[in-house]
Amino acid sequence: SVMGKFDLSSAKIKERFVGDIHFDDDWQIGLIVGNSGTGKTTIAKELFPDSYVTNFEYKEESILDDFPKEVSIDQITRTFNSVGFSSPPSWLKPYSVLSNGQKMRVDLATSLLQDEALIVFDEFTSVVDREVAKIGSHAIQKAIRRTDKKFIAVGCHFDVEDWLLPDWIFNTMELFVVFVAYCLFHIL
C-alpha cells in the first residue's frame, strides 16, 4: 500500500483553514483566488453552499432551446450578449460543440437568468486563454453591476482582479493552514 511505502499511519488527517473574509453589505462582486490545492473550492462551498454554480445540463440541439420556456428568447440573447457571447450562429449549436470560452459564457448567462441573488462560479476563467478571460471578466463585471445580484468568482488566476474589479478579494495564499493529525508521521 502507499501508506506502508512511506511508513505512514492510516490515522485520519484533517486540514483546517483559518482566515477571515471581510466585506461590506453593499458589495456586488467578490473574488476568491489562490493556487491549486489552497482551499478555494472548499471555502466557497462551505460559505455559500446554496449559491454554488454546478454543472448545468444542456441536452438540446440548440443552446437557445436549453433554457426554460418562461425565459424569452429576447432575455436569453440579451444575457448572452451581456456576458460576451455575441455569436448568433453559435447560439444555434448544442453546448457540447462550443469552445471552452463559449461554454463559460453560456454558464455565466445561465446563472444570471436564474432567480438566485448570489452566484458562486468556481474555476472562473481557468480553462480559457487570458484574452478570453479578460473579455469574459470585464463582460460579467458589467452585467452583474446592472443587476441587484452578487457574484463570487473562484479561480487560480490572479490577473482577473484587474478585469473583474471585485469589491473584495480573498487570497487563499494568505491563509493560515492548520494540520490536525491523530498521530505523528515521518517519511523514510
Pin down the residues of each PLM region.
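Pre-NBD coupling/linker segments of ABC/ABC-like ATPases
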Residues: 1-24
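A residue-level structural signal marking coil residues immediately N-terminal to beta-strands
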Residues: 115-117
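Conserved ABC ATPase signature
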Residues: 94-99
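ABC ATPase nucleotide-binding domain signature region
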Residues: 17, 21-85, 156-164
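Hydrophobic anchor residue at the start of the ABC signature
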Residues: 108
